[in-house]
C-alpha cells in the first residue's frame, strides 16, 4: 500500500514539474522565463510614467518623486 501511495506522489510531482517547465523557453529554467516576463512588465510600467534622468540612473524600482518632475 505504501509503495502505491509513494508511486502516486512521485507521479504527481513529475506532472507538476513538467507542466511548470512547459512555460519556459526550450532549454531555459522556469525562473529565467518568469524573470523575463517580470522585466517586460516592469518596462511597460516605466514607459507609462515620466521619469527624470537622475531617477533613471537609480536601481529598480525607479520611481520619480513629484518634486523631481517639476
From Swiss-Prot:
Its main location: secreted. One of its GO terms (molecular function) is toxin activity. Keywords: Disulfide bond, Secreted, Signal, Toxin. GO terms for cellular component: extracellular region. It is found in: Secreted. Expressed by the venom gland. Belongs to the scoloptoxin-04 family. This is U-scoloptoxin(04)-Er3a. It comes from Ethmostigmus rubripes.
